[in-house]
A protein has these predicted regions:
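Short hydrophobic/aromatic patch on the recognition helix
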Residues: 38-48
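Amphipathic alpha-helical packing segments from all-alpha helical-bundle domains
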Residues: 103-130, 136-154
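Basic, helix-initiating cap at the start of DNA-binding domains
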Residues: 1-23, 27, 32
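C-terminal peripheral helix-coil segments that are non-catalytic and often amphipathic
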Residues: 158-194
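Residues in the helix-turn-helix
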Residues: 29, 43, 93
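Amphipathic alpha-helical segments that line or abut small-molecule/effector binding pockets
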Residues: 77-92, 143, 147, 151
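Short glycine/proline-centered loop/turn elements that form peptide/ligand docking sites
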Residues: 24-30, 51, 130-134
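Alpha-helical structural segments
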Residues: 10-18, 36, 53-73, 78-85, ...
Length: 194
């Protein structure tokens, strides 16, 4: 019976994802989800409180369950590659859910998962450079980094996913995080021209 329950929950999640990709989140109703899944409306409420909970569950099931497992195995780079790949595989869906704003925004859900992923990473590999910056503690650093990753994913999906592959977006993200803009400015040549 438990297996059937898991299959029903997965079916509801799959139909939710398909419908969001086609119609968008705001126009989607619980009835539309249950009709697509071939179940009655009360069945939905056996698994989820509302469509926001489906969105959060899918983020965990489809992406962060596996990403977190890799993080726990101290395979940080693989987990980052997987994160970008998973978003790339379902980019139409993720473009649509990034439009969900307000109290239960997708962006906030994603931020919490990314922050947790980074906490796991730091648990295995403590930060070393914050000693020179006493006003920036580990939490502030991780929050800033999580915001950067979430916004990087959002920008890529909404603006550039048709032009930039998941692998290239991941490489670009790594490059941006390892170089400051000051490292990239051609200041020496500008000064020579003066």
């Amino acid at each position: 019976m438990e297996r059937k329950s898991e299959l029903t929950k997965a079916l509801l999640g799959e139909k939710f994802k398909d419908l969001v990709a086609k119609k968008g989140f705001e126009k989607l109703t619980i009835k539309m989800i249950t009709d697509a899944a071939g179940v009655i409306r009360p069945t939905f409420y056996n698994y989820f409180q509302d469509k926001y909970e489906v969105m959060e569950w899918l983020l965990w099931e489809d992406v962060f369950k596996e990403v977190s497992e890799l993080m726990e195995q101290e395979r940080g780079m693989e987990s980052l590659h997987l994160l970008f790949r998973k978003f790339g595989e379902d980019k139409t869906y993720y473009e649509k859910v990034f439009e969900v704003t307000g109290q239960n925004s997708f962006e906030e859900m994603l931020y919490r998962q990314v922050f947790h992923m980074e906490e796991i990473l730091v648990k295995h590999h403590p930060l070393k450079h914050l000693k020179n910056m006493p006003h920036v503690d580990e939490k502030v650093f991780l929050e800033f980094h999580a915001i950067s990753l979430v916004n990087g994913l959002k920008y890529w999906l909404i603006r550039e996913s048709k032009n930039i592959s998941a692998g290239d977006a991941m490489e670009f993200y790594q490059y941006m995080m390892s170089h400051s803009i000051m490292d990239l400015l051609d200041i020496e040549n500008q000064e020579k021209k003066k």
